[in-house]
Every structure is written in structure tokens, then in C-alpha cells.
Amino acid sequence: MRSPPICMKRTPKLARIRETARCKGADLCPASGRVFIGASGKRPRLSAQEYKHIVRILGNDLPGEKKAVVGLRQIRGIGYGFATAILDVLKIDNNSNIGYLTDEQVASIEKLLQDPAGAGFPTWFLNRRKDLETGEDRHIFTSDIEFTVRNDVERERVSGSWKGYRHMFGLKVRGQRTRNTGRKGGAVGVAKGGKVMPAKGGAGAPPQEEAAGAEPAKTDAPEEKKA
């Protein structure tokens, strides 16, 4: 006997599946309007217009099978907290696949990323506060991060500040200790047995042979008295 059909839960992720199932005449629960799946467990296929394999946001191609909160993190400058805040403000399910986002939702995400402060994001949530050129609080993404950091380092070097001095010589900038890490000199060689190799011409070097015909060196030691 065939197993009874399974009634799928009503979730935002499956909203489009229910709409497609209604169009194709699939079995629906008369009480809740949920989609029934037979014993095979196959879902109705979505058309190419509803699901997108690649979604482009801010010049980044995001795979459609990724969850929204995971896919947005592939954009440089967006972390987990920022991605979650974006989806919460726009009322988008975190677990929904990016491929199911509509064009309007994608446009709203890009609009919010261009001006997060205007959307109500707090100042401490942004990664570029009180910009030296404009004085504005903004959030930068992708290649703008590298460009901005490079300009900041160059400005410190030109101004001759202590930060610029450390950057110029490739040293640590933020007060880290450099006794063990951050060294650049060559390694000191040690002989087998743990003894340090003697320096050339030092105390451990063998005495040089006396030149032929030369008088032996005089010693200042006193002569012993004969008994």
C-alpha cells in the first residue's frame, strides 16, 4: 500500500512552491491550503522565471542555492550581524534561498546597502565612521575597502606620523611586542651539542703560528730564586 501523503508546513520558504502547485493542479489540504507530497517525496518543479541560479548584488554573483544570510556574507564588508540586520529590516526570511528573492527584494537590498545610516542603522554598526574627507558615517564594501585602507596608510606615511613610520619600515603598528614575533634577521647557527660556533679570531680561535726566525715573546713573570 502507498503511504499517506505528507502535509508540508506553511513556511515562507515554500510559498512559491504552493503557488506553483496550485497552478499545476496539485493536491492541496482543504483546511489549511498546504501542499501535499506523495510517497516519492518529489516537490513540484519551479519555472526558470521563479528561481535564479545566480543573483547579482553590488557586482557580486551569489549562488542561488545559498541561504540569504550565508550568501550575503560572501560580499566583502558584510558579516553575519550585518546580513541578519539587513534581512530583518526588509522582512526577508533568513533561511530562504537567494534564488527565490524577487527583483524588488534584490533592489531593496542594494538600496539599503548604499545608505545603511538612512535605513536606521546605528553609527557603531558601520565600518567607516567620520570619514576624514567627507565627515560622514558610511559603510564601505568590496574593492572600496582596499582602496580606502591604502589611502589611509599613504596619508600616514606622507604626514610623517608614528603610524606612518612603522608602516614605512614594515613594523607592527598597534603596540604589539616584537621580541619573539615580527623578526626579519637571519637565524643564528648553532653547532651540534648545543655549543655556539666560536667567532672568527675570537677567544676560542686556535693560536697563529709564530713567524720563522722571530724571537719568542717576552713574559713579565718574575724569575724564581735559586735556593
Curated annotation (Swiss-Prot):
Gly residues bias locations: 183-192
Pfam families: Ribosomal_S13
Gene designation: rps13
Role, per record: Located at the top of the head of the 30S subunit, it contacts several helices of the 16S rRNA. In the 70S ribosome it contacts the 23S rRNA (bridge B1a) and protein L5 of the 50S subunit (bridge B1b), connecting the 2 subunits; these bridges are implicated in subunit movement.
Record's keyword terms, sorted: Ribonucleoprotein, Ribosomal protein, RNA-binding, rRNA-binding
Compositionally biased residues, Basic and acidic residues: 217-227
Record-given protein name: Small ribosomal subunit protein uS13
Family: Belongs to the universal ribosomal protein uS13 family.
Keyword Ribosomal protein attached: yes
UniProt region (Disordered), positions on chain: 178-227
Low complexity composition bias: residue spans: 193-216
UniProt keyword rRNA-binding, yes or no: yes
